[in-house]
Amino acid sequence: MAKVSFIFVAIALITGNVLCQTDATYAVSSSAPGYKIDGHVRKTEAGLHIPLTLNSRGNKKTGIDTFGKTIKDITVDVEYETEERLHVKISDKAKKQYLVPDSPLGFERPQIKHYVSPKHSNLDFQYTAKPFSFKVVRKDDKTTIFDTTNMPLVFEDQYLELSTKVPEDANIYGIGEVTAPFRRTHNVTTLWARDNPDDFYRNIYGAHPYYQEVRDGKAHGALLMNAHGMDVITTEGRITYKVIGGILDFYFFAPKSGKPNDLSIAYTDLIGKPMMPSHWMLGWHHCRYGYPNIDKVETVKRKYKEANIPLQTVWVDIDYMEETKDFTFDKVNFPQDRMIGLGEQLHKDGQNYVVMVDPAISANTTYEPYVRGTEMDVWIKNADGSDFIGSVWPGFTTFPDWWHPNATKYWNKEIIDFVDMLGVDGLWIDMNEPASFCLGSCGSGKVDAGNQPYRWTYTEEEQAANHTRWEKELKAMGNPPGEERNLLYPKYAINNGAGNLSEFTVATTALHYGNIPHYDIHNLYGHAESHITRQALIKHKNKIRPFVLTRSSFPGSGKSVGHWTGDNHSFWPYLKNSIANILNFQMFGVSYSGADVCGFNSDTTEELCTRWMEIGAFYPFARNHNNNAAKDQEPYLWESTAEASRIAINTRYEMLPYFYTLFEESNRLGLGVWRPLIFEYPAYEELVSNDVQTLVGSDILLSPVLDEGKTSVKAQFPGGQWYDWYTHELTVDNKSNKKVKTVTLDAPLTHIPIHIRGGAIIPTKTPKYTVGETFATPYNLVIALDKKGQASGRLYIDDGESLEVKSSSGYHFHLQEWSPQGFWQVWLQEGRKDWLHHHYWQARQQVAKGSRWQEDYQIDPWQE
């Protein structure tokens, strides 16, 4: 049966920004000659080496050099890396095509000492000689999970194309970053990092060429490790990759269990496990772009307290800077001593402090960060070797080249000196796609020109004239020496929302260290900055977990940073779609992620902000943030919003031990903190498109109101017992293991329905105003019994901040043989074993030797 996303209601009417692709966008290159095996297929230690050459068509040139120079000789290397992961690399024999760097600034490839034998792998690689095609088959049920049969293989220097068959109406998830339904249907997803508000279906800040499919209750996944721009077309019966460079470097994943959560473990085994946040990072955050002065920031902090709405972290946007230059202070509105004093007061009050830093550095010879960077020669270059100078908030700017040998030393000094002086607890790195407000090196020869009018302040005619001039200058600059590719205007034009590739970013002809064109490395820029910034903070304080939040990301970014979904809008569809956006990043291995609560652009309303605070309080990263052009939206401004915020944030704080335990599991295993229902219950066909509810872990179900004017919500419940979090009453008893039960739940304006799964034990605390105060209270256990009268749960405890944890406890609880069925709370007296006395309903602590969580276990709770 056809499945329709819950997300879209009049999206195009609201945003006016749905792309219209042509039939050619969706078509495959049917005239391409393809390839055939040429020579001996050789078995290797890892698997297979297959030499290919272009199929001969005599004198016919049809399908040759269509979008670039056709590469005649290519190879296929098949590597059985683990029992659940298969690596298939299709590359040019001459090894001239650009690969993602094997480094923390790209993709750290696994160092495999012993490959598995094909017979022990859960994935089978099958191929056809002429025309060459291949299949990847999951062995346990003989399901073909990737199939290129009768699909063209195109391998040109600036165009790669490969397609796989998928079932009609397949359940595909992932491929981003894009604002779209969680389940991907008939559309084109473009991967080219771009500074732009979250337009539906258009490419935005990051690039994640990874998808998961759930088919017949089992999950598998595929990653294309390629940082070039690409279109990924999902259409009926097919997924097609159209890539403008590099190689086809695929990783396929098929966990033996078939469980989507085990697929997340397998994927993050490759790209890296998500970073572990400190306690304070799990609290409520507040920010605004456009606070006029520090008095206003301090007033917001005070009014949160007066309204008794918990506030853990105060953020300051670029407003604090002098002329929006990094590492400076507005002497009038945000003087340095007041900014330092704000941090000191926050820390005294048990709160935290984060500020923004952008990568673009003002090109001004009186500005020390620019002078030092110029002396160290760390800037991205033009094709002629001069510094590339774009335009961002402070006017004409240079951009650090993260791949330059001096870049780490340069950034370390700037970051460490600044953080040490200001006393902030973390950094927010924005505009790192990288963003530029002009086309090309528009500031060449204009160092010391100072602030420039922003492009949107010009009339349309003036903007067009400026663009014409910039484009003429960019073309005149030409390609880097020896470069034969068309870097500015490749013949295959991906569906970049900005138009040409160099629009509003660093020009594709600009050069990074080693003469690498930006064309080849663009999608890695924010990812590289994330790693270097994290390492700078570790160098500053090497015992404390660093905090970095990034806008642009790539597979593996979650090891270093968290992510917010960027400049969304204060419209109901964006509230609704925030769930899908966050679920995507859970799947991408960035578990510390969230959206701007109440919306960033445009004016929110009391009802919208109230409903957004209710679900936003449970985002893995939870922050209210809005734009300087929008009206105020602090949650204390409306009575209903304040009441809903107090309830929701206090409920989150009550659950902080549960959240923290989930983040530890994410850091150790790679599981998401938020989880889509279909990933926990893959046998339930009715859940495949549900992106309006979410699970927190496996045990807490959130069913928010996401539509204007509604005071109830239709919620889907999988099999089992589901208890109301607030009343402890049994809400749903679903005896089916394949069919959901849909229930209409009352949800007045200040209420978000929350349910706990029967069979779960949730560790909790008594909520206080700050995270520190909350964690200082005794632990409680909230127990919801299943139909057998049993329940289990887990609690992870450490000091809440150490980078290298030297002492931690892992507790696993199990309650059994208790009747009648019900809902109970159990008191935990920390550090003692007598709380497990039979008086507390025969609760038993299970320390299962050899279990996965046991790896972090160092303190035996049974010891005196």
From Swiss-Prot:
Top-level EC class as recorded in UniProt: hydrolase
Signal sequence bounds: 1-22
Residues of the active site: D430 (nucleophile), E433, D567 (proton donor)
Glycosylation positions in this chain: N187, N364, N406, N466, N500, N568, N734
Recorded GO MF terms: alpha-1,4-glucosidase activity; carbohydrate binding
EC number per UniProt: 3.2.1.20
SUPFAM superfamilies xref list: (Trans)glycosidases, Galactose mutarotase-like, Glycosyl hydrolase domain
Regions that span the bilayer: none
Matching InterPro entries: Gal_mutarotase_sf_dom (IPR011013), Glyco_hydro_31_AS (IPR030458), Glyco_hydro_31_C (IPR048395), Glyco_hydro_31_CS (IPR030459), Glyco_hydro_31_N_dom (IPR025887), Glyco_hydro_31_TIM (IPR000322), Glyco_hydro_b (IPR013780), Glycoside_hydrolase_SF (IPR017853)
Keywords recorded for this protein, A-Z: Glycoprotein, Glycosidase, Hydrolase, Signal
Swiss-Prot/TrEMBL catalytic activity: Hydrolysis of terminal, non-reducing (1->4)-linked alpha-D-glucose residues with release of alpha-D-glucose
GO biological process: carbohydrate metabolic process
Domain of life: Eukaryota
Similarity annotation: Belongs to the glycosyl hydrolase 31 family.
Its biological purpose: Hydrolyzes not only malto-oligosaccharides but also soluble starch.
PANTHER family from the UniProt entry: ALPHA-GLUCOSIDASE, P-TYPE DOMAIN-CONTAINING PROTEIN
Protein name: Alpha-glucosidase
Organism: Mucor javanicus
